[in-house]
Amino acid sequence: MPRTVFCQYEQRDAEGLDFVPYPGELGQRIFNNIGKQAWAAWLAHQTMLINENRLSPRTPEHRAFLEGELVKFLFEKDAQKPAGFTPEA
């Protein structure tokens, strides 16, 4: 039986993640409060940020930026698309 959490992103009960997806306290917060669909939405948003801003997850400054955007996206509903972003038709 899947684990259920109240997803703070979707503001409803949702299927929980199967594992802690991120290290540390933030990872535990995500595991306890974010559902699978919301996490998948973050991964898609993160990919867009990496591609549009030409970020490298290996660079500490870029990792810090992505972590800040992760918190904004999942918990603060304040994430924005990169400047000049236009989705493919």
From Swiss-Prot:
- The residue range of the signal peptide is none
- Which UniProt keywords are present, listed alphabetically? Iron
Gene Ontology annotations of biological process type? cellular response to oxidative stress
Recorded GO terms, molecular function? iron ion binding
Kindly name one Pfam family recorded for this protein. Iron_traffic
User: Could you tell me which InterPro entries the record lists for this protein?
Assistant: Fe_traffick_prot_YggX (IPR007457), Fe_traffick_prot_YggX_sf (IPR036766)
Family annotation (SUPFAM superfamilies): YggX-like (SSF111148)
Task: Tell me which GO cellular component terms the UniProt record holds.
Answer: cytosol
Does Transmembrane helix count among this protein's keywords? no
Report the superkingdom from the record.
Answer: Bacteria
Write out the similarity annotation.
Answer: Belongs to the Fe(2+)-trafficking protein family.
Q: What NCBIfam families is this protein classified in?
A: PRK05408.1
Annotated function: Could be a mediator in iron transactions between iron acquisition and iron-requiring processes, such as synthesis and/or repair of Fe-S clusters in biosynthetic enzymes.
Query: What is the protein's name according to its record?
Result: Probable Fe(2+)-trafficking protein
